[in-house]
Amino acid sequence: MTGIEQKTPVGGSETGGADGLYAVLPLRDIVVFPHMIVPLFVGREKSIRALEEVMGVDKQILLATQKNAADDDPAPDAIYEIGTIANVLQLLKLPDGTVKVLVEGTARAKISKFTDREDYHEAYAAALQEPEEDAVEIEALARSVVPDFENYVKLNKKISPEVVGAASQIDDYSKLADTVASHLAIKIPEKQEMLSVLSVRERLEKALSFMEAEISVLQVEKRIRSRVKRQMEKTQREYYLNEQMKAIQKELGDSEDGRDEVAEIEERITKTKLSKEAREKALAELKKLRSMSPMSAEATVVRNYLDWLLSIPWGKKSKVKQDLNFAQEVLDAEHFGLGKVKERIVEYLAVQARSTKIKGPILCLVGPPGVGKTSLARSIAKATGREYVRMSLGGVRDEAEIRGHRRTYIGSMPGKVIQSMKKAKKSNPLFLLDEIDKMGQDFRGDPSSAMLEVLDPEQNATFMDHYLEVEYDLSNVMFVTTANTMNIPVPLLDRMEIIRIAGYTEDEKLEIAKRHLLPKAIKDHALQPKEFSVTEDALRNVIRHYTREAGVRSLEREVMTLARKAVTEILKTKKKSVKITDKNLSDYLGVEKFRFGQIDGEDQVGVVTGLAWTEVGGELLTIEGVMMPGKGRMTVTGNLRDVMKESISAAASYVRSRAIDFGIEPPLFDKRDIHVHVPEGATPKDGPSAGIAMVTAIVSVLTGIPVRKDIAMTGEVTLRGRVLPIGGLKEKLLATLRGGIKKVLIPEENAKDLAEIPDNVKNNLEIVPVSRVGEVLKHALVRQPEPIEWTEQENPTAVPPVEDEAGASLAH
């Protein structure tokens, strides 16, 4: 092979002559700059031959980077035309056939033409000369490049720190620019571009620009790495400490599951849709729990608290059914009658279907025992698709029963409201508050006052239980309360929508017995319908002669008695079936307990049938009066309370003021004592609604005119003889019907209430509205008293005082 021609090596001011002929070593993924000493590993045959060729002559070779690193035998046009002339300092052949070579770049060169040589690449190239430039400007740039390069090397851990010391000692600015460029972490095309630039100033500017941009990125990377490292160290430290704690607890015999329980609670907190306040509270308690021994008493308290907090429903709602026809079917199937209540529920569902913003209604079902208040609430839950929970308030005296105990007390728990919500598992159940009128009050607080927050739609969205100490939303709950009387604190009563449920009529009871009570008795006693039957007449007789109530509880007990006796008879006598009729009814239930429709056989003087309202419905009230020789005293007995005593006084005063109109001689009041008795004596009685009955009894006694036996009456009387309205009309009319009385006198102002009375009640009674006592006496007495003429005496007699059982006087 011929020797390699070359130009005189170029420095800063050297100029090139004609092209020299050089062996070319194509480089992959590296650009060699002048003044750089670089080790290279050579494995391709052509490249090894090129090295062997130059080692035998002047050891100069042209290093040019190929454009595609994956090309094993690059064509001339696949090699960059700007390269570096380098001296081969050392060549070492390795056992695997590759060659390690140490080269030193001397000058830039531009390839003009490749030869046709086949065994290795060979090309003509001319060394490139750097232009003359302003030395002051270049020195200024160099002063900026060196400190930036130091900073860059500190941030980029891939570059050896010794390079910085070497770079700071370089006086040749061209060499400085090439040294910095060779160590920059830039792509091959960008490095090749730096190699192609002859101007030292431009090379320094490019290096400075790149380093400033890269330093910003490296600083961010450093911060990220530091943060990640700190986080990893913290995680590793916590893991290490937790493992140590587990090992210590295991040695001490503590539960191995203590930490697992904490992890489980943390997972539950993450999954539960807690309010912001509740989540902060839960995380704070969990943090405390982590620092405690699992076996400590305080840890148990915290665990119990977190369990309660996470067990109640947060945002979990049942889908409320809005099918009005379905709701009506459910209510009708499970309860007979009760039209007003059903109508109100269907109205609520209709509004709910249009607007989801409406608050749940708070209904209060008021009525006597056994009319189906509690079971109706269960049916409402079924009709609306809500979960059903019940809380009995009967006998509750402690406010903590509602709001819970504070956690400072040993064994503290949330109140019954939160406990019931946990049981419901949904945040919009139907919540039945049973017997709300039976709540008590003592030194521990007033639970009815605590209920004010629960039953106020404006407040219960932020209900605060003393145990939980976080607000809980009850605004989606549909509250239904039940009561026997309206004896409820006024603020609490004001928050509820009152729906009165009066007693059932005889026909309604008969239907309830046939549809519900009889099938239930057959099922509960494991009977077949063909084995046990009760005729309609028998059921009616049970209602009339064995029960006297507004509801159907006693009726249910009697039907159950029939079923029990039927089972006993079938098993004893091997009968195939038992049929109860009105003929054999007494064989199973014994003698009749109540009279029905058996009023007094004859009209009597001084005996009047009044009407009363009690907690268990309406009742007939017999009022008896007698007259005897005496000194004008009036005695009242029968366990009467103040209002009824005053009503008797008003009646007596009215009769005395109108004595001559009733045919009574005024001196008679001074010569006779009158005794009014209201059986039964053991039952307390109160209220003004027996006023007209008292007037009728006193007039009958003083005139001797009998009172009709088939008439009952109710109404308050004034001293002027007006009849005032009363309450509980439906219950009183039902009692009249049960008692077999056909005619009833009611105040005229109560006539408007007849619209709510069932038609079968109105059709079976002659209801007469009255406004004055004269009208009452016209209907009640067998004949009308005839007025008399009387001249006022000189010494008018005083109105006799009214005496109770003890003989104490009561002023009129």
From Swiss-Prot:
One Gene Ontology cellular component annotation held by this UniProt entry: cytoplasm
GO biological process, any: protein quality control for misfolded or incompletely synthesized proteins
Pfam family membership, one: Lon_C
UniProt record similarity statement: Belongs to the peptidase S16 family.
Binding site for ATP: 367-374
HAMAP family referenced in this protein's UniProt entry, alphabetically: lon_bact
Enzyme Commission code(s) on record: 3.4.21.53
Active site residues of this protein: 689, 732
Localization, UniProt: Cytoplasm
Region (Disordered): 787-812
Catalysis performed (reactions): Hydrolysis of proteins in presence of ATP
Description of how the protein assembles with itself and partners: Homohexamer. Organized in a ring with a central cavity.
Domain annotation Lon N-terminal: ranges: 22-215
InterPro entries: AAA+_ATPase, ATPase_AAA_core, Lon_bac, Lon_bac/euk-typ, Lon_lid, Lon_proteolytic, Lon_Prtase, Lon_prtase_N
Keyword field contains Methyltransferase: no
Taxonomic classification: Bacteria, Pseudomonadati, Pseudomonadota, Alphaproteobacteria, Hyphomicrobiales
Organism: Brucella abortus (strain 2308)
Induction of expression: By stress conditions (acid shock, heat shock, ethanol and puromycin).
Record function comment: ATP-dependent serine protease that mediates the selective degradation of mutant and abnormal proteins as well as certain short-lived regulatory proteins. Required for cellular homeostasis and for survival from DNA damage and developmental changes induced by stress. Degrades polypeptides processively to yield small peptide fragments that are 5 to 10 amino acids long. Binds to DNA in a double-stranded, site-specific manner.
Top-level taxon of the source organism: Bacteria
Name of this protein: Lon protease
Domain Lon proteolytic: 602-783
Main subcellular location: cytoplasm
Name of the coding gene: lon
Keywords assigned by UniProt, alphabetized: ATP-binding, Cytoplasm, Hydrolase, Nucleotide-binding, Protease, Serine protease, Stress response
UniProt GO molecular function: ATP binding; ATP hydrolysis activity; ATP-dependent peptidase activity; sequence-specific DNA binding; serine-type endopeptidase activity
Keyword ATP-binding (UniProt): yes
